[in-house]
């Protein structure tokens, strides 16, 4: 509707999904990796300047390996709905396993996280892929990022308790009574990371109101 179009085009990092009228294929067009209203706003120009040509595809560029990891980390840890969070962890694990053996990858990854202001999403990405997927991460990388998040013991325990519930697959064997609360807390956190309160509150109120209306109501 008109509100959603305005919301996407004014505040978001992407256009509304474009659907082919015959095939039904959906195309997402992004002009940034997080919303324009997010607390951390990595420079799209920095990402484009470091993009690399895709071999065998003239004129086609992809993000550099460090930026691929940071994009995946930023997307996952700015998320508000974690029902598919495990897929994000698997994606990060695959990227780190593929690029981790390359010369200077880890040094470049840390440097890029500073340039783009994404140290804390990278911290979370490395920590939880290590715990969940047994991803191999050099000690110096984890140590370099330790200061990007609150380090008090109780905060670390709380953060782990929440993320290690929310990031596991949505299955009875991986959930407990606290899992809905963990996902609920991250739902709120994700929205506050992406939008300041003076914009978030009216947006959520409007979406809640329209979500409660009967189907077919004008």
Residue spans of the language-model regions?
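Conserved NTP-donor binding/palm subdomain of two-metal-ion nucleotidyltransferases/polymerases, i.e.
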Residues: 1-218
